[in-house]
Amino acid sequence: MPSLPPQRAAVLAFLQEQAQAGVSPSLAEIAQAFGFASRNAAQKHVQALADAGLIELLPNQKRGIRLPGGAGRDALLALPVLGRVAAGLPIGADIGLERQLWLDRALFSLRPDYLLQVQGDSMIDDGILDGDLVGVHRSNEARDGQIVVARVDGEITIKRLERGAERIRLLPRNRAHAPIVVAADADFAIEGLYCGLIRQG
């Protein structure tokens, strides 16, 4: 499934909730629900979702939005956005609930427990960009080579994990950034595994 901007993902979640209730909303109702100035903004999101294969549009019908396979609220996850994570130098652990998003389970490889907003460009070669919201599956264990959210001396970062015989390194995916070598006496912990993203804007 393609990455979705948060607002488009929210429109999809709204359509799924309405489908669960047996309702196919009109463009005017979608525009009203999201505070859009006109039906055209709703049409843009609906058409993009249809082009991505996430919904079906029945021609010449005011209420012609259908979900493939009848997906409903069971396909949704309520995910809290818990602050920022550095894709660059580690940033302070300012974890705290910012908001909550309803998102499709199929957006993620693992079931995420929360979302973090990426700050920085050190993971761009893995397709993780500044401003993206990344899904994090809580785990204190990870395999060599996995993308992890890690805590180093009270600060958090997202990097690829490299377990060496004598040391751990957190590897960026941008040649402009240097690896983070975890000192033997560092306060280090794996907070979770990266399991997908949605793109802002």
From Swiss-Prot:
The record marks A87, G88 as: Cleavage. SUPFAM superfamilies: LexA/Signal peptidase (SSF51306), Winged helix' DNA-binding domain (SSF46785). Keywords: Autocatalytic cleavage, DNA damage, DNA repair, DNA replication, DNA-binding, Hydrolase, Repressor, SOS response, Transcription, Transcription regulation. One of its GO terms (molecular function) is DNA-binding transcription repressor activity. The active site is at S122 (for autocatalytic cleavage activity), K159 (for autocatalytic cleavage activity). Transmembrane segments: none annotated. It catalyses: Hydrolysis of Ala-|-Gly bond in repressor LexA. Residues 27-47 bind DNA. Its EC number is 3.4.21.88. The keyword Transmembrane does not apply. It comes from the Bacteria. It holds the Pfam family Peptidase_S24. Represses a number of genes involved in the response to DNA damage (SOS response), including recA and lexA. In the presence of single-stranded DNA, RecA interacts with LexA causing an autocatalytic cleavage which disrupts the DNA-binding part of LexA, leading to derepression of the SOS regulon and eventually DNA repair. Belongs to the peptidase S24 family. Homodimer. This is LexA repressor 1. The gene is lexA1.
